[in-house]
Amino acid sequence: MKQRTLANPIKAKGVGLHTGHKSIMTLRPAPVNTGIVFRRIDQTPIVEFPVSPELVKETMLCTTIVQEQDNQKIKIATIEHLMSALAGVGIDNLYIDITADEVPIMDGSASHFIFLLQSAGIQLQEASKKFIRIKKQVKVQNEKGGVAEFSPYEGFRLNFSIEFDHPAFDQTAEKMTLSFSSTAYFKEVSRARTFGFMKDMEKLRAQNLGLGAGLHNAIGLDENGVVNQEGLRDKDEFVRHKILDAVGDLYMAGHPIIGEFTAHKSGHALNNQLLRALVADPEAYEVVTYDDEEPPIQYGSSKILV
């Protein structure tokens, strides 16, 4: 299987969920073995962020990558939904030029990003696609009962369970398993929106968070249930969105993962902690390619320009 980039550049603009800052984002094709590289083009000189687990420095309600320049922290927040879409489509190499400190939230899911990527077209490249294959179990947990682990599996399977004491959540909608392929990702999780509790908004805004949030780009929950007039896109949209987030957070590894991911009450911090634990143990994984055989993960073939 070959590496993939975009066939053409494409632009999007929007508002950041937490900062409320407007930004223009340009996705541009990149050469083989470049990886995914975010670029703050509003900075002089331009600040580059080649994705890796170590670049994630803040995980309060979103995944934020940070570089230092002239003793100043330069950030890009809320990258997880775009990273999730890139993983879903199977993009290996891409420059992401952005004019502010947060990726636009769009509708709160990954569906707008997938539309952008498919509109630009997918270009196959003359190099083998690399995968990270899990060889042994790696597990992390936190003091709040959150657990995340990798284990060997021929494919990419995600098991996620959440636990919220709230009327909008019920037991039948708090667990989900996704056997990853592009088709399954598009159909099962790409449209699931981020969510938040109305009671927390005042506190968040005091911390300069949630400044761009609204019912047009998130699911709002009050003490009785969902506030959005249109309701949920799926009964279990909450756990579907958690899987969407996890797919994006785990793609910070730099390559698709072949293995099983199991999580309970995990979030951006624990997802990143798991990736760091994985790369810290060279015996836990290997980088593999599939030149003469089909990989255990299937990517859609639509919009591919050879």
From Swiss-Prot:
Segments traversing the membrane: none
Keywords (A to Z) from UniProt: Hydrolase, Lipid A biosynthesis, Lipid biosynthesis, Lipid metabolism, Metal-binding, Zinc
Catalytic residues (positions): H268
Catalytic activity line of the entry: a UDP-3-O-[(3R)-3-hydroxyacyl]-N-acetyl-alpha-D-glucosamine + H2O = a UDP-3-O-[(3R)-3-hydroxyacyl]-alpha-D-glucosamine + acetate
One CC-aspect GO term: membrane
Example GO molecular function: UDP-3-O-acyl-N-acetylglucosamine deacetylase activity
EC number(s) from the headed UniProt entry: 3.5.1.108
GO biological processes: lipid A biosynthetic process
Chain sites annotated for binding Zn(2+): H81, H241, D245
Cofactor requirement: Zn(2+)
Pathway(s) where this gene product acts: Glycolipid biosynthesis; lipid IV(A) biosynthesis; lipid IV(A) from (3R)-3-hydroxytetradecanoyl-[acyl-carrier-protein] and UDP-N-acetyl-alpha-D-glucosamine: step 2/6
Function: Catalyzes the hydrolysis of UDP-3-O-myristoyl-N-acetylglucosamine to form UDP-3-O-myristoylglucosamine and acetate, the committed step in lipid A biosynthesis.
Assigned protein family: Belongs to the LpxC family.
Protein's recorded name: UDP-3-O-acyl-N-acetylglucosamine deacetylase
Organism of provenance: Hydrogenovibrio crunogenus (strain DSM 25203 / XCL-2) (Thiomicrospira crunogena)
Upper classification of the organism: Bacteria, Pseudomonadati, Pseudomonadota, Gammaproteobacteria, Thiotrichales
Gene: lpxC
